[in-house]
Each structure stands twice: as C-alpha cells, then as structure tokens.
Amino acid sequence: MSTGDSFETRFEKIDNLLRDPKSEVNSDCLLDGLDALVYDLDFPALRKNKNIDNFLSRYKDTINKIRDLRMKAEDYEVVKVIGRGAFGEVQLVRHKSTRKVYAMKLLSKFEMIKRSDSAFFWEERDIMAFANSPWVVQLFYAFQDDRYLYMVMEYMPGGDLVNLMSNYDVPEKWARFYTAEVVLALDAIHSMGFIHRDVKPDNMLLDKSGHLKLADFGTCMKMNKEGMVRCDTAVGTPDYISPEVLKSQGGDGYYGRECDWWSVGVFLYEMLVGDTPFYADSLVGTYSKIMNHKNSLTFPDDNDISKEAKNLICAFLTDREVRLGRNGVEEIKRHLFFKNDQWAWETLRDTVAPVVPDLSSDIDTSNFDDLEEDKGDEETFPIPKAFVGNQLPFVGFTYYSNRRYLSPANPNDNRTSSNVDKSLQENLQKTIYKLEEQLHNEMQLKDEMEQKCRTSNIKLDKIMKELDEEGNQRRNLESTVSQIEKEKMLLQHRINEYQRKAEQENEKRRNVENEVSTLKDQLEDLKKVSQNSQLANEKLAQLQKQLEEANDLLRTESDTAVRLRKSHTEMSKSISQLESLNRELQERNRILENSKSQTDKDYYQLQAVLEAERRDRGHDSEMIGDLQARITSLQEEVKHLKYNLERMEGERKEAQDMLNHSEKEKNNLEIDLNYKLKSLQQRLEQEVNEHKVTKARLTDKHQSIEEAKSVAMCEMEKKLKEEREAREKAENRVVQIEKQCSMLDVDLKQSQQKLEHLTENKERMEDEVKNLTLQLEQESNKRLLLQNELKTQAFEADNLKGLEKQMKQEINTLLEAKRLLEFELAQLTKQYRGNEGQMRELQDQLEAEQYFSTLYKTQVKELKEEIEEKNRENLKKIQELQNEKETLATQLDLAETKAESEQLARGLLEEQYFELTQESKKAASRNRQEITDKDHAVSRLEETNSILTKDIELLRKENEELTDKMRKSEEEYKLQKEEEISNLKATYEKNINTERTLKTQAVNKLAEIMNRKDFKIDKKKANTQDLRKKEKENRKLQLELNQEREKFNQMVVKHQKELNDMQAQLVEECTHRNELQMQLASKESDIEQLRAKLSDLSDSTSVASFPSADETDPNLPESRIEGWLSVPNRGNIKRYGWKKQYVVVSSKKILFYNDEQDKEQSNPSMVLDIDKLFHVRPVTQGDVYRAETEEIPKIFQILYANEGECRKDVEVEPVQQAEKTNFQNHKGHEFIPTLYHFPANCEACAKPLWHVFKPPPALECRRCHVKCHRDHLDKKEDLISPCKVSYDVTSARDMLLLACSQDEQKKWVTHLVKKIPKNPPSGFVRASPRTLSTRSTANQSFRKVVKNTSGKTS
C-alpha cells in the first residue's frame, strides 16, 4: 500500500477487509480471536501474570456480553440425533425464535486436536458456505464455544442413497437420473477448485423433493493451477478409492479430479448390481482387486444391464490416463447412457425425481436410522499450567449467511457521513435487515408456491388418470351388460328345453300309470285263479299227492302275491313322487319367467344408469377444462408475482425513500396471494370432493349391478341343479320299477345261482384288489427311483448345457470360417465364367479335391475305428477297477464285522474281569486260577488282533495299489484323449490348409489368365455359342461344388458330435473320479479311527503288563479332532454370511461335511490334503473387516496348495493375468506397503501401527501376513523374524474358518499347526519376485472411518 493514499481511502480498504466474509480479519474473525484469548488465558495459573490479569479484567465482561449476543447452542432446541461419528454427532434442531428446522453438526475440539487433524473442517465450511450451488448442502451458520464447533446446515429429510438402495431395487432409469445429478454436483465442486476424494452413497443426501445433494467435504483438497493435487497419504473409502490414490501411500501422490469419476463408476455399478465391483472380505483383497481392475472387473450374468451402462462403467473404472471425464465434464454428458426423453441436463433439477419422500411433517426422520444414546463420558481440555492455546486453531470459524455487523461500503455515504445523523443510519440499517429477512421469507414462499403448483399438476394428472379409468370401467360395464343379454338368451333356450323335457316326463308318467293298471288286472285274475284252486282242493281231498302239489302252488302263489303287493305300493309311491316332481317343475318354470321379467327390468335400469354416467362424464370433462384454465391463470399470477419481487428489489437498491412504499405493496401482495391461494385451495377441495362423490356413486352403481347379476346367476344355477337332480331321481325310479317288473319273471333258482356267482366274483375281485395294492406299492417305489434318476439326469443336463454352449461357440467360429470360404468361392465362380482354359484347370482341381476328400474320409474312418477300440479298452479297464473296488469294499465290511465281534468279546471279558475282581476279595486261590484263564484269553485276543492288523495293512496296501492304478489309468486315458484330439485337429488343419492353397493357386492362375494379352484378344473373338457352352459347364461344376460342400459340412457335423460326446464322457469321468477320491479319503479316515480304537482295545485288555500313560506307540497316528466350523457362504460374508460344516481332521486329510448324515454316508463336500497345508494363523480386524467385531477372535485362516483341494461341483476358474505389484523382499518376506486405519500393532516393536486419519507407513507380508513399521526396514533394524511360509502365492489358496468360541479357535489352530509339514510340498518352491503374480496382493486400502470407529477410539 502506498503512503500517498488519503486516510479516507485507507480507512475504506480496512472497512472492506472487515466486511468481507472471506477475509481473515473480518469482524467475526476478530471477535473469535478475542473470545479464544479469554478462554485460553482465564486459568488460575496464568492469572498470576499481571499483564494477563489486567487484560482479562478489562475485556472479560465485554466478551461475556458478546457471547450472550452472538449465536449459541441454546438458541436451538434438539429434536433428534440423526447421525454420530468419531468427532461428534449430527442433530435435527429447531430455532426457538424463527421455528425453522435445520441439521446441526457438532465437532469436538478436544478430539480434533488430540488426533492432530484440526484443519479438515475448513474445506467443509468454505465449500458449504460459498458454493452457491443447488447440488451442495448449504451452510447457514457456523459458530463455536469452548468445547464444540457448530455447523447449522439445511436439513435433507430424504436420507442418503444407501437407505434408498436398501429399500428399492434400483432400475437403470433411476440409476441414470441419480448418476447425472452426481456428475453435476461433482462438476460444481471441481469448478470451485476442489477434489472431493470420498464420493460414495453415504455422502449423497436427498432433499424433500427427492433431488440429490453432496455432503461431507472433510476429505476435499484444493487443486493447483494445473488442476492437480499432491498428497502422500491415501484418503477415501476402500470400495470406492481409485488406484492412483492408493499408489500415493508412502510416496509422492500426484493426481487430479479423475479420481472422483472412478468413484462415480463404482457407485453406478453398485446401484445396478447391488454390490461394489471390487468386493472382498478383507482390505487386502479389496486393494489387490482395485490394483488389478483390468482383470477383476466383471459383470454378473443374471443382471440385465444395457451395453451403454457397461460401457460407461468400464470408461470410469479404467486407468487415469484414458478415464472418462479427464478432459472435462462435457465428454461425460455426451455419453449414450444419458440419452433419454424425460429430462435434459439444463432442466434436471426441475424434473420430478424417481422417489419423492413421503413426509408427515418438517421434522420427519423416517429415512434416518434410530441411534442409541451416547452414554460415554465426554473428554475436555485439562487445566493448563502454562499457555497452550487450545482455542487458537479455531479462530475465524464463525460464519453467518445473512448477517453483517457493519454498514455496506459506499463512497457517497462516506463523503456525506458527517452531515447525516447517526440515529437515522441505525434506523435505516434496521430496516435493511428487516427487508432482507422479508426477502428471504418471500423467496421461501415462492419456492413453496412452485412446489404447490407442481403438486397441483400432479393431482390434475391423477384426476385425468382416474377419469380414464372410469371410462374404462364404463366400457367394461357395457360389455358386461351385453354378456348378461347373451346369458339371458341362453337361459331362455334352456327353459324351453326344460319344458320339452317336462312334457316327455309327463308322457312317461302316463305310460307308467297304464302299466300299473295292467298289473292290477293281473292281480285280480290271480285272485280268481286262487279261488278256483281252493275249490279243486276241497273236491280232491282224497288224493295226497295232489294236495301236496296244491300246497306248494299255494305257497308260491302267496309269495308272488306278497311281492306284487309290495311292488304295487312302491309303484303308487313312485307315481305320487312323479306328480310332486311335475308340480315342482311347473313352479320352477313360473319362477324362471318371473326372473326373466326381473332381468329385463334390470337391463332397462342399467341403460338409464349408463346414460346418466355419460352425462356426468361430459360434465367432468368440462370441470377438468375449467381446472386447467384456473391453473394457467395461477401460473400467470405466479409469474406476475416474480416480476413484482424483482421490481421491488431494484427499487430497494435505487433509493431508501421508496422502502416504505415497497413494504406496503409487498404486504398487499401477500394478502392477495394468501386470499387467492385460499380461494384456489377451497375450489380445488370442492372439485376433488365432487369428483369423489361422483366416483363413489359410480362404484356403488357398478357394485349393485354386479351383485344383481351374481344373484340372478346363482339362482338360475341352483334351479338348474335342482331340476337336474329331480330328473335323475325320476329316471332312476323308473328304471327301478322296470327292474322290479322284470324280476317277477325270474325264478328263485336263477337268483340263487346268481348269488353263488356273485360270491365267486366277489372273492375273485378281492384277490384282484390285493394284487392291485401290491402293484401300486411297486409303482410308488418305481416312481421314487425315477424321481431320483430324473434329478441326476437334470444335473447331467445342466452340465451338458454348459458344454453345449462351448461347442456352439466353436461351431460359430467354424461357421464364420466357412462363410469366409464360401465368399472366396463365390468370387472364384464369378471369375470362372467365360474362360475355357480356366474351366479345364478347375476340372482338374475338382478331381484333385475329390481325391483328397476320399483320402480324408478313409482317414476319418480309421480314426473312428481306433477311437472305438480305445474306448472299449478303457471301458474294460474301468469295469475291472470297479470290480476290484467292490472286492475291497466287501473286505472292508468283513474287517469291520471282525472288529465289532472283537469289541463284543472285549466287553464280555471286561465283565468277567469285574466279577473276578469282586470274587478275589473273597478267595485268593480262585483269583489265581481265573487270572491264568484270563491270560490265555488275552493271548488269544492279541493273536487275533495281530491277525486283524495284518489284514488291515494288506487291505491298505491293496487300496494304495488300486489308487495308483486308477491314477495311472486316468493319466493314460487323458494322454490318449489329448493325442486323439490333437491328431484330429492336425488333420482338420491340414485339410483346411490344402484347400486354401488350392484356392489361392486357382486365384493366381485366374489372375494370370485374365492378364494375358492372348486371352484378351481371344475374348473379343469369342462367339455366343462358345459362351453358352461355357455357362452350361459352369453350372455343372457349380452343382458338383455344392454337393462336395454339403458332404464336407455333414462330415464336420459328425465329427463335431463325436467330439462333444467324448468331452461329455471326459467330464463325467472326472466328476466320478473326484467323488471316488473323496469317498476313499473319508473311508481312510474311518479306517484310521478303527485302528485307533483297536489299539485302545489292545492297550486296555493287556492286564498283565498294565502300561503307564506315557508309554504310547509311536507308530499310531496323532489324535483326531472334529467338530462344527463355519465357512464363508458363496465366498461373500457381507451378503450371505457363514455356512456351518462338520470338519474332521485325520492324519492325512481335512474333511468337510455339510451335516452329520453326510459324514455317516462318507459323502464329504470338500477334502484338503494336510501335506499341502502351508500356514495356519488367527486373523486380525484388517484381514476380515467385513466380519463383526465379536466374531474376529473366533476366526482363523488356513493356507494350502491348489493341488491339495478336492471338492464337489468344481468350476474351473479362468487364470487372470494380474499386474505386477511392487514388493520388498526381506528374510523370505514379501512386504507390501500399506496403511492401517483399524486397530493394529507392530509385531516387531509392539507399538501401535494404526491411526484413523494419518497412520504411520506400514508393511505387511503377503505370505505370512506379518505387520511392522516401515522404519524398521528402512533403518535396517534386525527386529523382524524370518518368514515362516515358503510357497508360491500364485499356486496357493486361503480359507477363513469361524469357530464356536475363542477357546475352540485356539484348539483348532494349535492342532493344525502341529499337522503342517516341516518341508514345503513338492512342486512348491519359493518363486522369485519377478515371476510372481499379484493375484492375492496384500495391500491395504483406506477408509475414512467416521461411523465405524465412533465409541472405539477415544
């Protein structure tokens, strides 16, 4: 500043510095400084200094007054705590005087100074305060006291995007919308000169209209002039951090804004798939996948993701040199993924969001999780004995968005300030503040009006949709009426049919009555005959034979008379029933006619209702037009209001005299607006109520029509059913009467014969029923077997489908090659026409090709015969092996039975020994004899035991020989198959090459002929007849060529089928071999257990020797261990949790069973060789940061070779070529630089190795996972022990196991550590660093732990 300036200009510049909110010496900053000094000096030990005491006595009272006047936490009432982190919490608050709702963030000064991170909040404050962007959460106020920093921000009631993704399955349409909003928000932050560096769904909040805003700017960093950032620590969340940020740890990190676009790609993938693309259970796994992103980025097959979305994700998740967005945000906006018909980039904020939060009030917190109360003790600054300055780092933090302590600078005012009264200036300043508050309120009212207009538009759309639905309902009603008419016609037709059937029934009834009358006449005749017979009996009383015959005749006649009487009574009953049925039919006919008339009346009523509905619909359409006109008028009034507001602001700036007039106009406008709004709302409510009434009336009418229709239909159906039942009863009764009449003519003898016949039939039918029940049981058993076979066939079909897909791909490649060949042939055929000499040469070539094809056929036949012979030999070998296996199984069963018998004998001997011991107390002599007998029995048992052990050893040797034979035969079979396939491929390639050479020769010859001069001259002289002959010959040759092609294609299809069959057989044999190996391993463990029991038996039965506990057999295997452990389900703990399995550890194998039933059936799901075991260790929180904290002490990790694993349903994983990672070799370790944000200690010096924000540089061995400070290696300190693991990382696998308790975990770890072989497995020599892949690179990723470390770090 030049000293020549006047005092007024100097004062004016100072005044501008004091007013500027971005200045470091503004009024708020100076007040913060005085406040901080008073806080830091007001202690008894410091007040002993006179200067400090005088300063405090002078300024303490005024500072206390200023503290009461400035904004403080007591000005707000807390509604609810909606978030909590490491430095404090976020509260939903309401201002006591204005009753406005805000989100207030509290940051503990003690925690920030303790963790030496007292500068991260400045960027957050500046971005939210000065962003002036709709995509960034706005900061209204920032203030402080002696314990906390307070940031009063706008409340986002929609919650974060994590909550949205957990409640909805996000479709691609929604993902496009939210990704576009994130892109615009990041562009706003980049335009301010900052990089966010922690873009994730947790930091994306939704406002009340469902639109997105970015928050949490604590990781932001200012860019230099080149748009780059230099940082030596990696900042961010592990799943969203970019490779260039990870590489910056412990080194010179230099990157730009493209690191934020990487996080956008991860966010888009997570929305569409449901999980992050580089998910792993450990930080090391996540870090290695991010560094190897070219190979580890994959898309699931079951998700329907568009090509544009995949392209955009791949463009984001790539190297920073070619990443989308490196050259500006415009290239992102031009991507095809963002093309749509619903919104544009310029109007994205004005469009309706996919999810608008349903809020009950302005303090609705339904989209936030309920948090428990923080019961921990809050730490504060200790009382210092000397000046510390704890409050000085926070000077200047205070900020007010709409408050100024000083008047606005104006040179004219400064010149005339001496003439203006101070009281007038103060009054004007107050009026300006009031106007600013009123303006702020007017802006809020304007926003509310716009929101109400949007809601009214939405309601109108809903009303239109409801009207359309009502129109559809009316159409449905009309269709139902037409259906009712059709049904009425059908019912009329049915009534006519029923009348006709009733007439037929009447005729039948008349016929039955005639038959009854004839039966009566017959009865009277029979009575007369009986009377005559009685007279004859009186006259011929002398003859006994005639009397007896007459008596017999009387008996029979009396029986027939009784039957006829019974039949007569039954006929009379049936006639009466038929008459009653006829009456009922007549009544039903009358009821049907009445119902028909009723349906006609209902139909006419429905027509009248439909006409009334049509009139109401026209009236509703007119009302909708009126509403639309009113809405347009409302929109015009809103525009007029906006124009008035702008005019008022201009008038306020021009002159202060017009302020009173503008206030009056504004008040009038407010009254008018409120009155119009109320009137419009009342009209809308009236119209909505009218619409609801009309809709209810329509629904009631529709329901009454449907109910009447359903009642009529039910009555008609009931009547029809009753008529049908009555008709069936009548017909049955008529049939019974006819049968009874016919039974009168049948004799008793015939009935007896029929009875006997029926009894025989009954017995025969019972036998048949028994046979059928047996057949049914057999069929059910067969059905169960068929179901099991179907399951196995379905499993095989799935495998065959996978093979079919692979073969289809190969066929497609062959077809493409074939198409290319056909295209070349087509070109050749075009050139053939019109060439006599060329045709002769082509004929020669065709003959040569035919000769080659015949040779090819003969070769194929020979190969097929050889393959069939080899297949037969292999089948024979397999059958022999199976027979040997069955014999071994029988021998094993015999051995088990022998062992059981020996166990029984041992039990008997133990009982005898117990009795002998009791009797030994009574008599010593008897005891000696029994001891001698028992010694003999023990000797016998020992002999049998030795025989059994020899048998078991022989069986084990035979088993090993068989397994060796199996392996050798499988290897030979594989080699033979590979040789056959290679020979076939070679023959095919030779044939293709010969054909290609022939074709190239033909093309070259054609070119030579065409380029000859003689040919050109002869071509001119050629006649038309020659040309025709050539064309005919060409056609013949073309036909022959087509035939040869078809034959060739048929041969290719045949060979392809044979190859498919062979590959399917190979897969089946491999799966069968794996199952056999796993079953053998389980059987071996069972045999081992039996041997251990036998050894225990021999030890316990040897009474004479009584060996001590220390004298054990060194040849016996170590003690087994078995129990329940949990493994990661589907390899993903976060989504699927843990899966329980029963684990058995024998001397050679580790067996995993799904349950105990599988263990009994010797059916393991996975088997590991103990010889291939490398390392066993407990895990730390950094290894499994996805797991719960209480589970970490129960988890341990095992490392083993790929070759030592055998599991069911093995899927061959593609070998990924990973990028080379830099690691340091030291004492066999392969150290990778990393940082720890979770609790971890150095294993060399036992000091802390972690920090939440600035952890020290660390190293971790990717073999044995030893952790240490980097300084130990840099300073060459001899504190690190050599690496305990010696294996190739690329050929090893690891597995996490969860025990039931911490003691169980220790037991498993100690047992498995003893099982690890001292020498590394064969074939696993330590690899050099250059040849190692980075498939399991152990680098740690970093996370800004705010939520997870709350309460843990103090």
Curated annotation (Swiss-Prot):
Its EC number is 2.7.11.1. Residues 422-692, 1011-1102 form a coiled coil. Residues 1101-1120, 1333-1354 are annotated as: Disordered. It catalyses: L-seryl-[protein] + ATP = O-phospho-L-seryl-[protein] + ADP + H(+); L-threonyl-[protein] + ATP = O-phospho-L-threonyl-[protein] + ADP + H(+). It is found in: Cytoplasm; Cytoplasm, Cytoskeleton, Microtubule organizing center, Centrosome, Centriole; Golgi apparatus membrane; Cell projection, Bleb. Residues 76-338 form the Protein kinase domain. One of its GO terms (biological process) is myoblast migration. Residues 368-727 are annotated as: Interaction with FHOD1. The modification N-acetylserine is found at residue 2. Residues 707-946 are annotated as: SHROOM3 binding. Its cofactor is Mg(2+). Residues 1118-1317 form the PH domain. Pfam families: PH_MRCK (PF25346), Pkinase (PF00069), Rho_Binding (PF08912). Residues 1115-1354 are annotated as: Auto-inhibitory. Homodimer. Interacts with RHOA (activated by GTP), RHOB, RHOC, GEM, MYLC2B, RHOE, PPP1R12A, LIMK1, LIMK2, TSG101, CHORDC1, DAPK3, PFN1, PTEN and JIP3. Interacts with FHOD1 in a Src-dependent manner. Interacts with ITGB1BP1 (via N-terminus and PTB domain). Interacts with SHROOM3. Protein kinase which is a key regulator of the actin cytoskeleton and cell polarity. Involved in regulation of smooth muscle contraction, actin cytoskeleton organization, stress fiber and focal adhesion formation, neurite retraction, cell adhesion and motility via phosphorylation of DAPK3, GFAP, LIMK1, LIMK2, MYL9/MLC2, TPPP, PFN1 and PPP1R12A. Phosphorylates FHOD1 and acts synergistically with it to promote SRC-dependent non-apoptotic plasma membrane blebbing. Phosphorylates JIP3 and regulates the recruitment of JNK to JIP3 upon UVB-induced stress. This is Rho-associated protein kinase 1. It comes from Oryctolagus cuniculus (Rabbit). The lineage of its organism: Eukaryota, Metazoa, Chordata, Craniata, Vertebrata. The gene is ROCK1.
